[in-house]
Curated annotation (Swiss-Prot):
Helicase C-terminal domain residues: 214-375
Organism for this UniProt entry: Staphylococcus epidermidis (strain ATCC 35984 / DSM 28319 / BCRC 17069 / CCUG 31568 / BM 3577 / RP62A)
Annotated compartments: Cytoplasm
UniProt motif (DEAD box) ranges: 150-153
Motif (Q motif): 2-30
Gene: cshA
Protein's recorded name: DEAD-box ATP-dependent RNA helicase CshA
Domain annotation Helicase ATP-binding: ranges: 33-203
Family annotation (SUPFAM superfamilies): P-loop containing nucleoside triphosphate hydrolases (SSF52540)
Assembly information from the UniProt record: Oligomerizes, may be a member of the RNA degradosome.
Keyword Nucleotide-binding: yes
């Protein structure tokens, strides 16, 4: 295995990397760094967590040391990723007087303008704010020789493809080295490569380097109304160190977060309506172990680079393979093992098969935990917590109450009663989650008869106030209730599912 010095990295940077604990380059760093130092364009296919920031950042430091003015522009899909990349570049360049400035929305632009006037060598930013500075001419392009697009497919998914083209067109092609990194290569990214890159060197980390050995992928078949109970049972049994839970909508994220909090779990939610200040606060809590469950939409989770995530739960199945790849890529990083569990309604199995076919690997079926397994896991957790509590000094008033109780009750029975209350404390807490329709079957028409409202209540975890009352399966029941849905049906963009027998309404749209 080559070391960094053999790849052409200077002694000063090598010393810094070794002080950071980086003795040897990762596969993508080993393959990319020589080409980057030569000035070749690079097309890298790799997920976050494979060392790709070092793949472009380490050679970039070598190229900008001693230079004046903006030499390099790095585009990232989100503020968080931009800040993370900038921080890593500062670490790589310690003691070498390399200035790195971040520019992104949600922060005062005047402060960024002042920072740009100081002539940093490297600018890291989100596409929208970079264009703002280009239009204001506060970001000059004449000295830029290296353009890097990090997580290009994420930027495309967020609607930045035209912004990326605009920015690439602003930097003279004859002087520009372009490095583009992406976990997936959709058609729009391929077209971008053909239009703006010059015979790029293709660096691709193989699947077995990215996710296969590190992530155990499972699916569990569960009906919508039983999903939350099944999910919390998995949480109790798995006891994840850090978990990210994906919901399909903002409403789902809000309701899931509230439901988890009411059950005693330490959770916070992230979606597009969360303010930047709140978002940073939530991420800080997650990274500092103040919360251990992060509930997020796909958009809100894009660009997150959080180490130590042990579990990813797809509470709602993703609609495409690329989203699935990005979701589960949040765990199993840096050689650590991870677990990804996808909850799937029986009629959504076509989506599981599509993901398996595209990724060329099979997920394992996972049965929901039995009640005995859940209680055993809770008991073990309570036992550990009690041991921690016993190391604390108790307040005198509690000791007095304890003495009074021990006079009245047998000590073993007293402790057993308290433990039982702790183990089952949250079982009776009712939560409310809006019913979400399963995804339509792929390549076939979806009929309403496949979603009749004969699902069981799910231990009282869902609010069924809007559930249709039971009726016969005959035509008279359909006619009786059809008017109730006509108005909503007309609002649907495409042909709706027919209402046969006992079905659910489109609740709380």
């Amino acid at each position: 295995m080559q070391n960094f010095k053999e790849l052409g990295i200077s002694d000063k940077t090598v010393q810094t990397l070794e002080a950071m604990g980086f003795k040897e380059p990762t596969p993508i760093q080993k393959d990319s760094i020589p080409y980057a130092l030569e000035g070749d364009d690079i097309l890298g296919q790799a997920q976050t967590g494979t060392g790709k920031t070092g793949a472009f950042g380490i050679p970039l430091i070598e190229k900008v040391v001693g230079q004046q003015g903006v030499q390099s522009l790095i585009l990232a899909p989100t503020r968080e990723l931009a800040m993370q990349v900038a921080e890593q570049l500062r670490e790589f360049s310690k003691g070498q007087k390399v200035q790195v400035v971040t520019v992104f929305g949600g922060m005062p632009i005047e402060r960024q303008i002042k920072a740009l006037k100081r002539g940093p060598q490297i600018v890291v930013g989100t596409p929208g704010r970079v264009i703002d500075h280009l239009n204001r001419r506060t970001l000059k392009t004449q000295g830029i020789h290296t353009l890097i697009l990090d997580e290009a497919d994420e930027m495309m998914n967020m609607g930045f493809i035209d912004d990326m083209r605009f920015i690439m067109d602003k930097i003279p092609a004859e002087q520009r080295q372009t490095m583009l990194f992406s976990a997936t290569m959709p058609k729009a990214i391929q077209e971008l490569v053909q239009q703006f890159m010059k015979a790029p060197k293709i660096i691709k980390t193989m699947n077995n380097e990215m996710s296969d050995p590190q992530i155990d992928e499972y699916y569990t078949i569960v009906k919508e109304l039983e999903k939350f109970d099944t999910f919390t049972n998995f949480l109790d049994v798995h006891q994840p160190e850090l978990a990210i839970v994906f919901g399909r909508t903002k409403r789902r994220v809000d309701e899931l977060t509230s439901a988890l909090l009411s059950k005693g779990y330490k959770a916070e939610g992230l979606h597009g309506d969360i303010t930047q200040a709140k978002r940073l606060e939530v991420l800080k809590k997650f990274k500092n172990d103040q919360i251990d469950i992060l509930v997020a939409t796909d958009v809100a989770a894009r660009g997150l680079d959080i180490s130590g995530v042990s579990h990813v739960y797809n509470f709602d199945i993703p609609q495409d393979t690329e989203s699935y790849t990005h979701r589960i890529g949040r765990t199993g990083r840096a050689g650590k093992e991870g677990i990804a569990v996808t909850f799937v309604n029986p009629i959504e199995m076509d989506y599981i098969r599509q993901i398996e076919d595209v990724n060329n690997r099979r997920m394992k079926a996972l049965r929901p935990p039995h009640r005995k397994e859940v209680l055993k896991a809770r008991e073990d957790d309570i036992k550990d917590r009690v041991q921690n509590w016993m190391s604390r000094e108790n307040e005198p008033r509690l000791q007095r109450i304890s003495s009074e109780l021990l006079k009245e009750y047998d000590s073993t029975e007293l402790v057993a009663s308290l433990l039982q209350e702790l183990v089952e404390a949250n079982d009776e807490v009712e939560v409310q989650l809006t019913f979400e329709k399963p995804l339509a079957r792929k390549n076939r028409s979806s009929k309403g008869g496949s979603r009749r409202s004969n699902h069981k209540r799910g231990n009282g975890k869902f609010d069924n106030k809007n559930r249709r009352s039971k009726g016969s399966k005959g035509q008279s029941s359909k006619k009786k209730n059809q008017k109730k849905f006509d108005r909503r049906d007309k609002q649907q963009k495409s042909g709706n599912q027919s209402l046969k027998g006992r079905t659910f309404a489109d609740h709380q749209k």
